[in-house]
Amino acid sequence: MPQLDTSTWSITIMSMIMTLFIVFQLKISKYLYPSNPEPKSMTTLKQLNPWEKKWTKIYSPLSLPQQ
């Protein structure tokens, strides 16, 4: 059974890593970043829940008048 020649593996792996690095650098360099990011104004409007829109009175058994 012939021996597997691994002498070219190191140059193959190094060239693959360099190629991936260059490709990712080119992809990232095409992305446009905002020059001066500013925070958005977060004005939240308070939304009323259905039970907050109208007045309701809750009667618990202990608050009922005694008979």
From Swiss-Prot:
Protein name: ATP synthase protein 8
Coiled coil: none
Residue numbers of N6-acetyllysine PTMs: K54, K57
Family: Belongs to the ATPase protein 8 family.
Membrane topology: Single-pass membrane protein
UniProt keyword Acetylation, yes or no: yes
GO cellular component assignments: mitochondrial membrane; proton-transporting ATP synthase complex
Main localisation: mitochondrion
Keyword Transmembrane: yes
UniProt keyword terms in alphabetical order: Acetylation, ATP synthesis, CF(0), Hydrogen ion transport, Ion transport, Membrane, Mitochondrion, Transmembrane, Transmembrane helix, Transport
Chain segments annotated as transmembrane: 8-24
Job of this protein: Mitochondrial membrane ATP synthase (F(1)F(0) ATP synthase or Complex V) produces ATP from ADP in the presence of a proton gradient across the membrane which is generated by electron transport complexes of the respiratory chain. F-type ATPases consist of two structural domains, F(1) - containing the extramembraneous catalytic core and F(0) - containing the membrane proton channel, linked together by a central stalk and a peripheral stalk. During catalysis, ATP synthesis in the catalytic domain of F(1) is coupled via a rotary mechanism of the central stalk subunits to proton translocation.
Organism: Felis silvestris lybica
Pfam family, one: ATP-synt_8
Lineage top rank: taxon: Eukaryota
